[in-house]
């Protein structure tokens, strides 16, 4: 699963996830993309589950790019532990998703196959998504 090799600090504060995705909002590698229309947090496990679903559907047909990376640590205290005595340990990693962010891209397959594969991937993700094509300028 995806996670940073090393970070400057082990733990982060919760923060707020506001605004729109300024970077990573255009399809830049493949021909088709899966774009987030809602906001939320996607865990490394969810990113991997969606990738597997797409890869299995397209078989050896196309190339898939993952455009998000889980770089925010989420901590949790063990069960039945009293409050206090510091922040819990890092449990998992998430990517914060804003509306407009392209999550995955695909190339080398037909549009119909790409739509089907992205529909399978979208079912694994906690944010609402839409299918987008590369815009030719």
Curated annotation (Swiss-Prot):
InterPro entries in the cross-refs: Ribosomal_uL16, Ribosomal_uL16_bact-type, Ribosomal_uL16_CS, Ribosomal_uL16_dom, Ribosomal_uL16_sf
Cystine pairings recorded for this chain: none
Any single Gene Ontology cellular-component annotation: cytosolic large ribosomal subunit
Alphabetized Gene3D superfamilies for the sequence: Ribosomal protein L10e/L16
Keywords, ordered alphabetically: Ribonucleoprotein, Ribosomal protein, RNA-binding, rRNA-binding, tRNA-binding
Pfam families membership: Ribosomal_L16
GO terms of biological process kind: translation
SUPFAM superfamilies assigned to the protein according to its UniProt record, in alphabetical order: Ribosomal protein L16p/L10e
Function noted in UniProt: Binds 23S rRNA and is also seen to make contacts with the A and possibly P site tRNAs.
Similarity comment: Belongs to the universal ribosomal protein uL16 family.
UniProt xrefs under PANTHER family: 50S/60S RIBOSOMAL PROTEIN L16, LARGE RIBOSOMAL SUBUNIT PROTEIN UL16M
Listed name of the protein: Large ribosomal subunit protein uL16
Organism name: Cellvibrio japonicus (strain Ueda107) (Pseudomonas fluorescens subsp. cellulosa)
Name of the coding gene: rplP
């Amino acid at each position: 699963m995806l996670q940073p090799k090393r970070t400057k600090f082990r733990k982060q504060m919760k923060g707020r996830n506001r605004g729109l995705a300024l970077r990573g909002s255009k399809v830049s590698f493949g021909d088709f993309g899966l774009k987030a229309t809602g906001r939320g947090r996607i865990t490394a496990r969810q990113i991997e589950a969606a990738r597997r679903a797409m890869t299995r559907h397209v078989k050896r047909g196309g190339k898939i790019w993952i455009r998000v990376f889980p770089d925010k640590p989420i901590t949790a205290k063990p069960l039945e532990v009293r409050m206090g005595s510091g922040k819990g340990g890092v449990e998992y990693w998430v990517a914060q998703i804003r509306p407009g962010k392209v999550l995955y891209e695909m190339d080398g397959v037909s549009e119909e196959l790409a739509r089907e594969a992205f529909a399978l991937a979208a079912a694994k993700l906690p944010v609402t998504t839409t299918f987008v094509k590369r815009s030719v300028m």
